[in-house]
From Swiss-Prot:
Domain ATP-grasp: 9-244
A GO cellular-component term linked to this record: succinate-CoA ligase complex
Tree of life domain: Bacteria
Name by which UniProt lists this protein: Succinate--CoA ligase [ADP-forming] subunit beta
PANTHER family per the UniProt record, alphabetical: SUCCINATE--COA LIGASE [GDP-FORMING] SUBUNIT BETA, MITOCHONDRIAL, SUCCINYL-COA SYNTHETASE BETA CHAIN
Length: 386
C-alpha cells in the first residue's frame, strides 16, 4: 500500500526523522492559508499523487510570495500529471503539500528495501541525490553504497556511520545523518514497510540533515497490525478494479495485454502469464482467485476481468486441490450467463472432480473451448484472440 508524501513525512517525524514543516491543502484557498501559517519567505507547492517524477512533470513549484502560491496551486490542482510512473493516462491532482522552503547545500539518496536474494533489509545510499536511483544504478553503480542488515540485531550505528562517510556527508553532520538513518530504519521495521525511500536527503545551509521527499510503501499483508497506516489509504489513487477485487479476497493486478487470466494460486498465475507470452500473446492481468473460491468469487472475477475494455478473450486455468473443479465449472457458467460473455473463453481444468467439472462445462450449451493442458489452453486463446 502506498501513501502520500505528506503522510509519509508525518510517519517519519514521529520517529525523529527531520522533515520540513508543511501543510496539506485541498483547495487553492487552503494552499494560500497554509503558506500564510508557515510564514516563510519561500514555499514549495507540491502535487500529491502516488507516483514519482512529479517535478519533471510540473507538479513541484517554488513560490516566493503568496501570489505565486495561489498561481501555482490554481495551475496544479485538478490537472492530470503524467510521469514515468503513472503511465500515459496520468493521475489527477486532488491535494497539495505546501512546505517551507529549504536552503539546500547538497542532495543525497537514502533508501531501505527488502533484498529477496539475501532475505535481508538493505540500506542503500548515494551522493547522487535528486535523480532516479535506477538511473544511477545503470550509469554509475559504483556510486551506490549498501549495508545489509542482520534482522537479529537491526541496523547498527557503525553501519549508518559507514554509509554517511561513504557518501561524503560533512563530518560535522555525520551524527545527525546517523540519527536520521536509525529513525528511518525504526519506521521501516515497526510499520512493516517494503520500501522507505528518501530522495533527496539534503544537508542545509543552517547545518541540518533533512528529508525533502519521502516515499513509503507498506506490506498490505501486515496492515492488520498497523491500523493507523491503513487509515492513510487513499482509494482514489488506486485502480478501481484492484479495490473491487480486494472486497472478494481476489488478488488482481492489471497489465497491458488483451488476454484476461483467471487462475488459482500465485505460482500457477505467473506460469500462465509466462506461457501466454511464450505463444506470443499478452496477458491483460494477474488474477489469483485463491484456494477457496466459490461460484460467487468466480463470477466477480469475471466481472473484474471484463471491466478492462482491452480484454479480447479469457483463459481460465484451474488446478483443483482444495478447490474443486465442479465448483469452478459452475462458477464459470454462472458468470458467463450473468455478464452475457461474447468473448472467446478457454477453460483448462485439472485436479479434484475434474471429470465432473468437464461434464458440467460440456453440457452447459455455452461456447466454451476446453483445453487439455496449460500449453494447449494458451495456444488456443492466443489463436482465438488473433
Amino acid at each position: 500500500m502506498n501513501i502520500h508524501e505528506y503522510q509519509g513525512k508525518a510517519v517519519l517525524r514521529s520517529y525523529g526523522v527531520s522533515v520540513p514543516n508543511g501543510k496539506v491543502a485541498f483547495t487553492v484557498e487552503e494552499a494560500v492559508e497554509a503558506a500564510k501559517e508557515l510564514g516563510t519567505e519561500v514555499c514549495v507547492v507540491k502535487a500529491q499523487i502516488h507516483a514519482g517524477g512529479r517535478g519533471k512533470a510540473g507538479g513541484v513549484k517554488v513560490a516566493k510570495n503568496l501570489e505565486e502560491v495561489r498561481t501555482y496551486a490554481e495551475s496544479i490542482l485538478g490537472t492530470t500529471l503524467v510521469t514515468h510512473q503513472t503511465g500515459p493516462e496520468g493521475k489527477e491532482v486532488k491535494r497539495l503539500l505546501i512546505e517551507e522552503g529549504c536552503d539546500i547545500k547538497k542532495e543525497y539518496y537514502v533508501g531501505l528495501v527488502l533484498d529477496r536474494a539475501t532475505s535481508q533489509v538493505v540500506l542503500m545510499a548515494s551522493e547522487e541525490g535528486g535523480t532516479e536511483i535506477e538511473e544511477v544504478a545503470e550509469k554509475t553503480p559504483e556510486k551506490i553504497f549498501k549495508e545489509y542488515i542482520d534482522p537479529a540485531v537491526g541496523l547498527q550505528g557503525f553501519q549508518a556511520r559507514r554509509i554517511a562517510f561513504n557518501i561524503n556527508i560533512p563530518k560535522e553532520l555525520v551524527g545527525q545523518a546517523v540519527k536520521f538513518m536509525m529513525g528511518l530504519y525504526s519506521a521501516f521495521i515497526e510499520k512493516d514497510c517494503s520500501i522507505a525511500e528518501i530522495n533527496p536527503l539534503v544537508t542545509t545551509g543552517d547545518g541540518k540533515v533533512m528529508a525533502l521527499d519521502a516515499k513509503l510503501n507498506f506490506d498490505s499483508n501486515a496492515l492488520y497490525r498497523n491500523k493507523d497506516i491503513l487509515e492513510l489509504r487513499d482509494l482514489e489513487e488506486e485502480d478501481s478494479k484492484e479495490i473491487e477485487a480486494s472486497k472478494y479476497d481476489l488478488n488482481y493486478i492489471p497489465l497491458d495485454g488483451n488476454i484476461g487470466c483467471m487462475v488459482n494460486g500465485a505460482g500457477l498465475a505467473m506460469a500462465t502469464m509466462d506461457i501466454i507470452k511464450h505463444y506470443h500473446g499478452d496477458p491483460a492481468n494477474f488474477l489469483d482467485v485463491g484456494g477457496g473460491a466459490t461460484a460467487e468469487k468466480v463470477t466477480e472475477a469475471f466481472k473484474i476481468i471484463l471491466s478492462d475494455k482491452n480484454v479480447k478473450g479469457i483463459f481460465v486455468n484451474i488446478f483443483g486441490g482444495i478447490m474443486k473443479c465442479d465448483v469452478i465449472a459452475e462458477g464459470v457458467i454462472e458468470a458467463t450467463k450473468q455478464v452475457g460473455l461474447e468473448l472467446p473463453l478457454v477453460v483448462r481444468l485439472e485436479g479434484t472432480n475434474v471429470e465432473l467439472g468437464k461434464k458440467i462445462l460440456n453440457e452447459s450449451g455455452l461456447n466454451i473451448v476446453a483445453a487439455e493442458s496449460m500449453a494447449d489452453g494458451a495456444q488456443k486463446i492466443v489463436s482465438l484472440v488473433g
